[in-house]
A protein has these predicted regions:
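Transmembrane beta-barrel wall of Gram-negative outer-membrane proteins
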Residues: 24-25, 237-270, 274-313, 343-364, ...
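Short acidic/polar hinge/loop motifs at secondary-structure boundaries
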Residues: 135-136, 142-145, 173-204, 220-223, ...
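Short strand-turn segments of transmembrane beta-barrel domains in outer membranes
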Residues: 205-207, 216-254, 264-277, 568, ...
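Surface-exposed extracellular loop regions of Gram-negative outer-membrane beta-barrel proteins
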Residues: 315-320, 541-555, 598, 609-639, ...
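Outer-membrane beta-barrel signature, preferentially recognizing the C-terminal barrel domain
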Residues: 330-352, 356, 639, 643-650, ...
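C-terminal beta-signal and adjacent terminal beta-strands/loops
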Residues: 731-733, 879-898, 902, 910, ...
Length: 1006
């Protein structure tokens, strides 16, 4: 009996002890990677040793809680519609509930929500003024989802930044152009299905594939396994870009044997309803295969390209648009044999090959090794002429404003845009009649006269073409090698990093595309011939050929290179690292990189103007006739200016540091901040004064420094979505180079500026609010900023033919223009007020703004999404867009006649008589009128036996507003008055947005 009692007591004590064994759990919030927005309805599965021990579902705010877990290691899998599965290891210790803070999920192409980005399948390329996305990604963020696509037609720049500040990756390799820094949209345009799956970071946020900059980054996965499984076909037509797009894509998805493969092809053909001469004849293809091995290794091979051609649009002056009665006028085309022919056609074929090796032995570690090669050609045709009149129909001498009555030719023309018929001379009136007539008899005057160009060449006695069509080439060979790692150290911290190497060798040259009826084109410098006609050696574009072939200029036939030929060589190496800590509702990230960049020019032609060093020129002179002797050209430092061979190599150290701090609160509130400092090397295009002709690099070339910060508040709960951001960015020590014909020098010149500073500050606000009607929501976005120039850069102007420096000084009215106080004197005349020292009193300044983007952009709309129907109606407002400035107009030289001998501004209200009126006429920056637009879209999809049929229709600019300027520039030329007392501007040139336009897409998924 005692034994029985003892046994029962032991059992009861053991049971009590067992009941008291500590149990814990796991909690956190499931959020999207872009914007940290909550993901409701996500499914969580907790497993131990392959057996499911618990399940849960995230709430409306993304929160989840799994309890009653014994101490130990668990595997947690999270799945959600539209996102990639997430698998992590979780350790429960001492009965505590483990807080995972944020479980971030990456969007997946496998399941698509019905939203605007699916319906509006934008084609992204470098066409300049078409409807390309302004932010390369869209997301659930209430601001980015609108700004990413909805503002693209107006050329909106996110926070006023140029596109080169946004990092674009393909399969983990940064693809921004090595020469210019710009995002290479044209490499994958037309491959929408393949590039749909992407990962994004916004603003200063870092990523898993690089430390990034201050304008966000996008990584297009591109792997075959990321392409949506099944077959998709689509047919699209639109009225603003091209007539027809056909697209076919197939993805196998991951197969049982570990293989995945995908293929895609598309064609875009035809013109549009608005801009004559603009057309597409472009194609695209993608081939990809991927093998997943059983030990965590994956190997993928991808190849894609977008061969094709498209006709381009040209900007024109408002005078031309008004004469034609059409803001969509395009001066690039004319009729040839009854067919439209565009003189400016871009032809491209730049295939990209990617080999990627991924090693992920566990859920906590991943490494990726990627090799990417970009090659091919990119050509752009244009007219060239020699010893002949300018063939462009909108050339200023062909316009009525060139011939006023009772004035000397060239007098006051640019100041008189609003002339009447009676103001014109007889010649000007004939021009006016020719431009305004709608008779077919004047088509050859209003557009390119191809027949005249051919006839001029036919009548050439020796077969030499006076007119030809050139093709300017930028042919890249771009090699990239990348190694990235990601290591989850524990449940709340992740370390990532990598090494990137790039070598780019790009050939710049031009060749003859069409001799236009002639037999050859002479390879000489027409500008040099005007100045140095007595020395034939000096005008040669290829002096070595001239000497080797009996002192005869090279005759170029179709396909031959001429004019210039050089290589731009760029090397970039970068080491980056990032650390992310998520604990107790805090999220902390720090990242940074250090890098090295170098570049040099390598000339392939010896130009007679810059034949070489003193020793090289001495050797050449021994071969040249006595009447054609040359001299070495020396720069201001006594160094020889050369054209052939390697230039000096410039070396730069680069780097950045970034920090991110976030605090989440109950109820879906989050506050976060970013801070970043960047030191970037200038690009090749910003460094060389005239790479077409010589090896000279601009002086005082230094790194560009950027300081950026933002503060954010976000609320996301129960369908409500709000984000508010305040940002500030300072960019210092930028450089810029341009070349243009300077009438004051009667020569083609180069203009280099250094020390350009900018300041960008503003706010972003976005919201999405559900309305009482199921599926209906109110959405709004506001971007309000001030993007200004804050320095007066230093400029050096040189003659292109001689490298002679003709001007060097600051550009005193680049960043702002002083506004002076005035008073009325005893005679009732207005005068400038002076202080006690005799200086004019400044009452304020008129700022100059970063151009070609609205500083204020807003949208308010209704969105209805239910039962696979999608409808959206939105109104947009854009304001404070400004014209791109010509720095020459902001120099003291261009403002001559405005100041007295003491340097004080002369008060004058007549713009044609110098003084203050003329000063403000020369220095003011044009601001475009505010714009109001109305857009709508509708879409529907049906599921039939797991197959999908759908359509989408988008209509933009419903009010048919044809007066919307999207950009433009001041011409880089000056006109003298007949008295030579003052200079005048040339008329500015503009681009306009098309009127009402549509895009209709029908798609099938099997």
């Amino acid at each position: 009996m005692k034994k029985l009692v003892s046994i029962l007591s032991l059992i009861l004590v053991s049971a009590a002890l067992l009941a008291q064994t500590p149990t814990g759990g796991v909690t956190g919030a499931v959020v999207s990677r872009a914007g940290r927005l909550p993901i409701p309805g996500a499914n969580l599965i907790i497993q131990k040793d392959g057996q499911t021990v618990a399940t849960s579902t995230s709430a409306s705010d993304g929160r989840f809680l799994v309890e009653a877990l014994a101490d130990g290691m668990y595997q947690m899998t999270i799945t959600a519609d539209g996102y990639k599965d997430l698998r992590v290891n979780v350790t429960v210790d001492n009965g505590f509930v483990k807080d995972m803070i944020f479980m971030t999920m990456t969007p997946d192409v496998q399941v698509e929500s019905v939203d605007a980005s699916n319906f509006t399948e934008f084609d992204m390329d470098d066409s300049g003024y078409n409807d390309n996305p302004t932010i390369l990604f869209s997301s659930n963020d209430p601001y980015n989802s609108v700004a990413g696509y909805g503002f693209s037609s107006i050329r909106f720049k996110n926070r006023g930044y140029n596109s080169e500040t946004q990092d674009v990756y393909f399969s983990g390799v940064r693809l921004n152009d090595a020469i210019t820094g710009y995002s290479p949209y044209s490499l994958w345009t037309g491959l929408n299905e393949v590039t749909r799956s992407k990962e994004t970071s916004t603003g200063l946020e870092s990523s898993d594939y690089g430390s990034g900059g201050y304008n966000g980054s996008t990584n297009i996965f591109g792997n075959p396994s990321n392409v949506r499984k099944g077959l998709r076909a689509s047919v699209l037509t639109n009225s603003a870009m091209y007539r027809l797009r056909l697209m076919l894509t197939y993805g196998s998805g991951p197969l049982d044997n570990g293989w995945s493969y995908a293929v895609s092809a598309s064609a875009r053909v035809g013109g549009n309803d608005w801009i004559k001469g603009v057309y597409y004849r472009s194609f695209a293809y993608y081939l990809g295969a991927e093998k997943k091995f059983g030990d965590g290794k994956t190997l993928a091979l991808m190849h894609f390209a977008t061969p094709g051609q498209r006709g381009a649009q040209n900007a024109s002056t408002q005078e031309v648009y008004d004469l034609m009665g059409d803001n969509m006028y395009n001066s690039n085309w004319g009729y040839q044999n009854g067919k439209v022919r565009n003189s400016r056609v871009r032809k491209t074929f730049e295939p990209v090959t990617v080999l990627r090796y991924r090693y992920a032995p566990s859920a906590n570690f991943e490494s990726n090794t990627i090799f990417l090669w970009r090659t091919g050609f990119n050509g752009y045709t244009a007219l060239d002429w020699y010893d002949a009149s300018d063939p462009r129909p909108d050339y200023y001498r062909n316009l009525p404003s060139y011939s006023f009555a009772n004035s000397t030719e060239g007098d006051d023309q640019s100041a008189r845009y609003d002339y009447s018929y009676d103001d014109l001379s007889k010649k000007g009136q004939l021009m006016y009649e020719a431009w305004t007539s709608r008779s077919s008899d004047y088509l050859m005057y209003q557009h390119l006269n191809w027949d005249r160009l051919y006839n001029v060449n036919y009548n050439s006695a020796d077969g030499r073409s006076k007119y030809a069509q050139e093709q300017r080439h930028v042919d890249q060979n771009d090699l990239n090698l990348v190694e990235n790692i990601k290591w989850r150290i524990n449940d709340y911290s992740v370390l990532s990093g990598g090494v990137n190497f790039k070598y780019n060798r790009t050939e710049y040259y031009k060749k003859i595309a069409d001799l236009l009826g002639g037999e050859y084109f002479l390879n000489v410098d027409s500008f040099a011939e005007r100045d140095f006609a007595i020395n034939e050696a000096k005008i040669q574009n290829d002096l070595d050929y001239y000497i080797a072939n009996g002192f005869k200029s090279e005759k170029i036939t179709k396909g031959g290179k001429y004019g210039y030929d050089y290589f731009a060589n760029v090397i970039k190496a970068n080491l980056w690292a990032g650390y992310n800590l998520q604990k107790d509702n805090w999220d902390i990230k720090v990242s940074g990189n250090v890098g090295y960049e170098s570049f040099w020019r390598e000339g392939m032609m010896r130009k007679g103007l810059f034949a070489g060093t003193e020793g090289e020129v001495a050797e050449l002179n021994r071969k040249l006739p006595a009447t054609q002797q040359l001299k070495a050209v020396l720069d201001a430092d006594g160094n020889a200016v050369t054209s052939k061979g390697k230039s000096e190599t410039k070396h730069f150290l680069t780097g950045s540091a970034k920090a991110y701090l976030s605090r989440s609160f109950k109820g879906g509130h989050r506050v976060y901040a970013n801070l970043g400092v960047f030191s970037d090397a200038p690009t090749f295009n910003e460094a060389f004064i005239s790479p077409r002709t010589r090896n000279t690099i601009i002086g005082n070339l230094r790194n560009k420094f950027t300081y950026s910060a933002d503060l954010n508040y976000q609320y996301s709960n129960k369908g409500y979505n709000v984000r508010f951001t305040a940002f500030y960015t300072k960019i210092k020590n930028q450089s810029d180079v341009m070349s243009f014909y300077d009438d004051s020098q009667n020569s083609f010149t180069n203009f280099a500026m250094t020390g350009i500073d900018q300041q960008h500050l503003g706010i972003e606000f976005g919201f999405s609010v559900p309305l009482p009607v199921t599926g209906l929501s109110l959405e709004g976005v506001l971007s309000a900023g001030e993007y200004t120039y804050t320095s007066n850069p230093y400029m050096v102007q040189t003659i292109d033919n001689s490298a002679e420096v003709v001007r060097q000084s600051t550009v005193p009215y680049w960043s702002k223009v002083p506004l002076y106080a005035t008073y009325e004197d005893a005679a009732g005349m207005t005068q400038f007020d002076m202080d006690g020292d005799g200086n004019m009193i400044v009452k304020g300044y008129k700022k100059h703004y970063v151009p070609s983007t609205p500083q204020i952009a807003a949208q308010l709309g209704l969105k209805y999404n239910i039962n696979y129907w999608f409808l959206e109606l939105n109104a947009q407002c854009f304001a404070k867009s400004h014209l791109d400035m010509n720095p020459l107009y902001r120099t003291d030289f261009a403002c001559k006649g405005c100041f007295d001998e003491n340097g004080n501004l002369i008060y004058n209200e007549d713009v044609n008589k110098g003084g203050s009126a003329h000063f403000y006429y020369m220095t003011d920056q044009e601001e475009f009128k505010p714009v109001f637009l109305l857009n709508a879209s509708v879409g529907k999809s049906w599921y039939i036996n797991n197959n999908q049929l759908g359509f989408s229709l988008q209509v933009n600019n419903i009010t048919n507003n044809r007066g919307v300027k999207t950009g433009g520039y001041e011409q880089t030329r000056l006109q003298n008055s007949s008295s030579k007392d003052v200079y005048y501007r040339f008329q500015s040139k503009y681009f306009y947005m098309s009127g009402i336009n549509y895009m209709l897409n029908v798609y099938f998924r099997f």
